[in-house]
């Protein structure tokens, strides 16, 4: 039976885009796992298999993420992109790695908007193969985007607030008034606190 899976990569970083991806297939007859549990090399190898399946994705830039956080919420933005992906789905049944605390609420919203059978589950990227496949697409595409940004702006580490290298990069950029507007999420507390500390 044809099913689709949806997952995102890059929800939490202070630097770089978020990628939301969908994969659809009758069956996955090769090894997949939650992208976070795989090495980068393993993800890339599996990506070559997964990318041969029907898939769609969106790369969501920091400015759009900031705008959503200011006006509504990050969850609201993910709802919008999940809806867009579902409407492109080649199957009637879609599994989503749930980004809302309330699985049934998100299911209801997306079912009402799309008319499709939507099943939202926490840890679906770990437990459901088609969602694992989507997580690999999203993660590898985001990794590629991050490498492009590093080739322009220099090595900023992982882009996550917990990464000391990322924090040093941000602090250096703020002190030197470097133009990093296109890559940083200004609505993140990490960035706001650093800016506040150097006013």
From Swiss-Prot:
GO CC annotation: cytoplasm; ribonuclease H2 complex
Annotated EC: 3.1.26.4
Binding site for a divalent metal cation: 7-8, 97
Location relative to the cell: Cytoplasm
Biological processes annotated in GO: DNA replication, removal of RNA primer; mismatch repair
Pfam families attached to this UniProt entry: RNase_HII (PF01351)
Signal peptide: none
One GO molecular-function entry: RNA-DNA hybrid ribonuclease activity
Positions of transmembrane segments: none
Cofactor note: Manganese or magnesium. Binds 1 divalent metal ion per monomer in the absence of substrate. May bind a second metal ion after substrate binding.
Catalytic activity field: Endonucleolytic cleavage to 5'-phosphomonoester
Keywords associated with the record: Cytoplasm, Endonuclease, Hydrolase, Manganese, Metal-binding, Nuclease
Taxonomy, superkingdom: Archaea
Similarity comment: family membership: Belongs to the RNase HII family.
NCBIfam families: ribonuclease HII
Protein name: Ribonuclease HII
Species this protein is from: Picrophilus torridus (strain ATCC 700027 / DSM 9790 / JCM 10055 / NBRC 100828 / KAW 2/3)
